[in-house]
Amino acid sequence: MQAQIMNKIFEIFSKNNPKPQTELIYKNDFTLLVAVILSARATDISVNLATKHLFETYNTPEKFLELGEEGLKKYIKSIGLFNSKAKNIIALCQILIKNYQTSIPNNFKELVKLPGVGRKTANVVLNCLFAMPTMAVDTHVFRVSKRIGLAKGNTAAIVEKELLQIIDEKWLTYAHHWLILHGRYICKARKPGCNICPIKEYCEYYINTFSS
């Protein structure tokens, strides 16, 4: 995709939603990290429902250790992979207290050392908490970026690299939020809403599918 077209796409995203934010609901830095871990293979809606009451009482690593693994499971049992997620989160709390004085690390290498934190989770945390220009590639970002022509890769890691190369730095702080929201509400997997899409004239899928 040409840089000029890429810029047109993100100009439209920026005009329609200047400062998009994560739809995960959280109380502080720690609860955002927990929410992002829980969101793996789960929807933000399901995570928010599970954490609504959890975060009201338990919102620090110390309080999570008081709750314990079995106690945590009771709150998050509606979320996929809740057993392994509970185990990882409790282990993560111990490490945060011991090594980081309960603070969340602000660099990628330290974050991915934490239990339950992979590349995507680390990138989300760095972006949302520290405003770093990272590119967290989830299923929405992966699908949308390939469909509209921003990337061609067949893995999340390759797509991430492609997006960081093509997207102008001025857009990167919000780029993954725009792509996620576009995929969640307009460019859906099974039935993309091309009729309401604000960027369709620049989208490779739309041009190839509907242009005569």
From Swiss-Prot:
Listed cofactors: [4Fe-4S] cluster
Keyword check for Iron-sulfur: yes
Cofactor binding annotation: Binds 1 [4Fe-4S] cluster.
Residues of the HhH domain: 108-127
UniProt enzyme class: lyase
SMART domains recorded: ENDO3c, FES
Species of provenance: Rickettsia prowazekii (strain Madrid E)
Catalytic activity entry: 2'-deoxyribonucleotide-(2'-deoxyribose 5'-phosphate)-2'-deoxyribonucleotide-DNA = a 3'-end 2'-deoxyribonucleotide-(2,3-dehydro-2,3-deoxyribose 5'-phosphate)-DNA + a 5'-end 5'-phospho-2'-deoxyribonucleoside-DNA + H(+)
The protein's name in its UniProt record: Endonuclease III
Any Pfam family matching the protein: HHH
Task of the protein: DNA repair enzyme that has both DNA N-glycosylase activity and AP-lyase activity. The DNA N-glycosylase activity releases various damaged pyrimidines from DNA by cleaving the N-glycosidic bond, leaving an AP (apurinic/apyrimidinic) site. The AP-lyase activity cleaves the phosphodiester bond 3' to the AP site by a beta-elimination, leaving a 3'-terminal unsaturated sugar and a product with a terminal 5'-phosphate.
Keywords: 4Fe-4S, DNA damage, DNA repair, DNA-binding, Glycosidase, Hydrolase, Iron, Iron-sulfur, Lyase, Metal-binding
Gene3D superfamilies cross-referenced by the UniProt entry: Helix-hairpin-Helix base-excision DNA repair enzymes (C-terminal), Hypothetical protein, domain 2
Entry EC no(s): 4.2.99.18
A GO MF label: class I DNA-(apurinic or apyrimidinic site) endonuclease activity
Signal peptide feature range: none
Residues where [4Fe-4S] cluster binds: C187, C194, C197, C203
NCBIfam families, per the entry: nth (TIGR01083)
Disulfide cross-links: none
